[in-house]
Amino acid sequence: MGLSWTVPLEWGKNLSASNPLGFLPDHQLDPAFRANTNNPDWDFNPKKDPWPEANKVGVGAYGPGFTPPHGGLLGWSPQSQGTLTTLPADPPPASTNRQSGRQPTPISPPLRDSHPQAMQWNSTAFHQALQNPKVRGLYFPAGGSSSGIVNPVPTIASHISSIFSRIGDPAPNMENITSGFLGPLLVLQAGFFLLTRILTIPQSLDSWWTSLNFLGGVPVCPGLNSQSPTSNHSPISCPPTCPGYRWMCLRRFIIFLFILLLCLIFLLVLLDYQGMLPVCPLIPGSSTTSTGPCKTCTTPAQGNSMYPSCCCTKPSDGNCTCIPIPSSWAFAKYLWEWASVRFSWLSLLVPFVQWFVGLSPTVWLSAIWMMWYWGPNLYNILSPFIPLLPIFFCLWVYI
């Protein structure tokens, strides 16, 4: 026996109609109550409404127009009727423990009250207790012994150390690994930057060289050739088809030789300053060092130096003379002595130079004045060599 729903077509009249899909308003039908037209109170729905209000569009859980205002598919709850209600949250239960939470740490009693036996120890009692193998094993787990008589008891620390000795050390520190990788990368980046800057030195010097031939004007290479005429361009960037290309290559080659000579001079000065050029000085009264059988050094060098500290020569009288080699600037002193012998007037400059250096305020004022007057021109000339300064500094520090 199926259930049916009564549709009120007219006022006060109810007819029975089937509700197979359940989309019509929900009304409770009790077959035992024998609901029919003669019994109008057949509907047990407490939220029932007259038919004109049922035709109104209600706002329910499925949006406007989907759920009737008197229940339906979702039942009779306030949410299904389109009414949102917020229930207050239940208050937390009252705590019965009034001592909850972190309590303050009680003050520790004095050592004489908590450990009275520790106050009775002294140096003598401690050394006597160390005679016990068990106690000594706690203080000397690695087997150390001051008397060499007592054998300590092996402890857990000794077992762990033996295990690590068999299986290897723990994982290495990642900070050391990172620094080991970043160091070479930074050096490589700095080297690449200096290389790119050094490659610009020939072009800068070439531009300065060519500007000397075009005083008061812009250096322009016409570049006219019978085979392949080209437009006007800078003389420092001539194409291979330009007649000025060979002169540009020649200038670049001379500039490279000049830079190489400058680096060699700097390296020579550095080695001479470090004392790595043991040059025999000139014997007073002679222009050259004579060659003879006793030219080798007969006095050993002082300290751990691998270079001789003196040089023995055989002058014209036949007697060997040993002259000590300066520990620094030996080659420079040799060149100065050689130049003083060749050009006697250089010796007259020594007192003047010593006097001028002694006047330090005058020297500094003169240097400041010269830099103020010639500074811009010197900067334009020396600016191409600025990338070489870091290389010279590294050589000076690490050699």
From Swiss-Prot:
It is found in: Virion membrane. Residues 2-252, 202-252, 369-374 are intravirion. Glycans are attached at N319. One of its GO terms (cellular component) is membrane. The chain crosses the membrane at residues 181-201, 253-273, 348-368, 375-397. Residues 2-118 are annotated as: Pre-S1. Isoform M is N-terminally acetylated by host at a ratio of 90%, and N-glycosylated by host at the pre-S2 region. The large envelope protein is synthesized with the pre-S region at the cytosolic side of the endoplasmic reticulum and, hence will be within the virion after budding. Therefore the pre-S region is not N-glycosylated. Later a post-translational translocation of N-terminal pre-S and TM1 domains occur in about 50% of proteins at the virion surface. These molecules change their topology by an unknown mechanism, resulting in exposure of pre-S region at virion surface. This is Large envelope protein. It comes from Hepatitis B virus genotype G (isolate IG29227/2000) (HBV-G). The lineage of its organism: Viruses, Riboviria, Pararnavirae, Artverviricota, Revtraviricetes. The gene is S.
